[in-house]
């Protein structure tokens, strides 16, 4: 079951991000996914604006899997400026939430900056009691 969660997350993220390689080929967008026992990390790459023959790596998505309590925590989600305003991050969170829900896992976004926290609360994510930098994604969270 544990390996299945890793595989489901990897497949979901990969199939979602794959079309963006074509959409952003001028920016040389690419990504790689690494799994380890308790997490998945997606590294993105795009053309270095100062050295066009090189790419700049960035952490696109980092999540931890807490198998014992059936939770997944997203601690990092980042998109370069040229990928903003297309709801890419929201849809990726929604896709991950969908597969986790089917497996009986809960999804949390943690270590949030205040502005993102407020946005997610406004979108219907549940605040975590006693914590002002984490929310739980639920069915009623607006991720469109």
Language model features: what each stretch is:
Residues 1-84, 91-144:
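Non-catalytic substrate-recognition and accessory regions of acyl/acetyltransferase enzymes
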């Amino acid at each position: 079951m544990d390996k299945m969660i890793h595989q489901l997350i990897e497949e979901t993220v990969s199939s979602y991000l794959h079309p963006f390689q074509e959409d952003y080929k001028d920016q040389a967008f690419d990504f790689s996914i690494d799994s380890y026992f308790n997490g998945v990390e997606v590294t993105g790459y795009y053309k270095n604006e100062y050295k066009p023959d090189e790419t700049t790596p960035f952490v696109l998505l980092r999540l931890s899997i807490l198998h014992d309590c059936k939770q997944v925590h997203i601690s990092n989600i980042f998109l370069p400026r040229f990928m903003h305003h297309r709801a890419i991050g929201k849809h990726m969170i929604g896709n991950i939430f969908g597969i986790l829900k089917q497996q009986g896992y809960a999804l949390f976004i943690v270590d949030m900056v205040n502005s993102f926290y407020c946005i997610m609360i406004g979108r219907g994510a549940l605040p975590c009691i006693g914590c002002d930098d984490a929310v739980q994604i639920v069915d009623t969270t607006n991720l469109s």
